[in-house]
Each structure stands twice: as structure tokens, then as C-alpha cells.
């Protein structure tokens, strides 16, 4: 029962003469929570709340987290060896500890995310694409690729700068020349030498 970009759906339900409404989970947004139910009951509609509530809240977990914390839900993905290392020695080529199944799961996580964030070290070491790949992923959107690069070390010929499949956002400590950046690349300045993740999440 909230006026936002669209009018309240409660008015449409009452106007249509709907006699019964089943709600799996209450709206997690505290500014509107409960108002729609009250309006429907006052309009003579039979309202049931809580059917498959756990399943509904799981589907809305990202949105519910944002409503509560006003920050995006963060999922960390890491592959390590038996000693807890995520890569081999810097003097050797980049190592991959992931199995085929873990790679599939990684792309499933990417497909459910709005952005993928890495540090400049990952870009320099691996030259990743940070796109969603896999035959079973389905037609989902490609997340924004975010690189924390305070000192503008990103190579102009790396995949994130050359590949236009998804937008690339560079988080930097100062303004740098962006006149040669392709259209899919955007730069944002957070004026701190060591950029805290909290500042990025608050953007």
C-alpha cells in the first residue's frame, strides 16, 4: 500500500473485487510493511499470511538484506589449496585450484549477482573476464565488473577494458585520464589511499 514508481497494488485488488489474498511473506521494507494487509482487510478481503514463508524469504534474501542494512548482500568466493593459499608463488604462472563443479557453482553465483568485485592484483595476475558462462546458466543478466584500483594500474589491453560484454567500474583514489577509455568503462573516485570496502558498499 505504497506510492512509489507505481500506485499501490491494494487499490487494484480492491477495484478488481478479489475476495481472498494469500501472502507468503510480509514486505521487508519497514516503510510499507503491513499497510497493504490492513487496507485489504478493511476492504473486506480475506487475507492469509505466512504460506511457505521460509521459501519466500529465501528467494528475497538479497532484497531483505538491503531493506535491513541499506547495503548489498555480499557473497565471497575463494578457492584454496590444503594450506589455505589462493594462488601459487608470484614467480610462477597463476594456479587454479577449482574443480569443474566448483567453477559451475561460481558461475551460478555470478548469475545471481548484480556485481563482481575484485582487486587490481587479480586483474594483473589472472586477466579475468568476470562474465557469466556455462550452458545451464540460462538467460540472466551479466553483472557489473568492479575493480578496486587505487593507483590506476589496470592495463588498457586487459579483458575488462577490451571486452564490452558487461560494464566495468574502476574504483580509484584519484582522478586519472579517462579520455581513451571505451564506453563501457566508468571511473569513480574515493579519495583514500587504501579504499575501504565499506565505502564501496555505500555507493
Residue positions per predicted region:
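Generic structural signal for helix capping and beta-alpha/helix-loop junctions
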Residues: 30-31, 57, 155, 178
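Active-site ligand-binding patch in enzyme domains
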Residues: 1-2, 9-10, 65-67, 71-203
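Short, structured interface segments
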Residues: 52-67
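Zn2+-dependent cytidine deaminase-like catalytic core
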Residues: 1-56, 193-195
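Short, surface-exposed, charged/polar-biased interaction segments
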Residues: 34, 39-42, 61, 68, ...
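Short, flexible helix/strand-to-coil boundary loops that buttress conserved ligand/catalytic motifs
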Residues: 25, 60, 90
Amino acid at each position: 500500500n505504497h506510492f512509489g514508481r507505481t500506485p499501490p497494488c491494494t487499490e487494484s485488488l480492491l477495484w478488481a473485487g478479489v475476495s481472498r489474498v494469500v501472502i507468503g511473506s510480509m514486505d521487508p521494507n519497514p516503510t510499507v510493511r503491513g499497510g497493504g494487509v490492513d487496507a485489504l482487510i478493511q476492504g473486506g478481503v480475506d487475507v492469509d499470511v505466512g504460506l511457505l514463508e521460509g521459501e519466500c524469504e529465501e528467494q528475497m534474501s538479497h532484497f531483505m538484506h538491503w531493506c535491513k542494512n541499506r547495503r548489498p548482500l555480499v557473497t565471497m568466493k575463494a578457492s584454496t589449496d590444503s594450506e589455505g593459499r589462493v594462488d601459487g608463488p608470484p614467480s610462477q604462472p597463476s594456479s587454479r585450484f577449482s574443480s569443474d563443479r566448483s567453477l559451475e557453482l561460481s558461475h551460478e553465483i555470478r548469475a545471481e549477482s548484480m556485481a563482481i568485485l575484485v582487486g587490481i592484483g587479480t586483474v594483473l595476475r589472472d586477466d579475468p573476464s568476470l562474465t557469466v558462462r556455462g550452458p545451464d546458466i540460462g538467460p540472466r543478466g551479466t553483472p557489473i565488473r568492479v575493480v578496486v584500483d587505487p593507483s590506476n594500474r589496470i592495463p588498457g589491453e586487459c579483458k575488462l577494458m577490451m571486452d564490452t560484454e558487461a560494464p566495468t567500474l574502476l574504483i580509484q583514489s584519484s582522478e586519472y585520464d579517462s579520455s581513451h577509455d571505451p564506453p563501457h568503462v566508468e571511473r569513480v573516485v574515493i579519495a583514500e589511499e587504501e579504499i575501504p570496502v565499506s565505502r564501496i558498499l555505500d555507493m
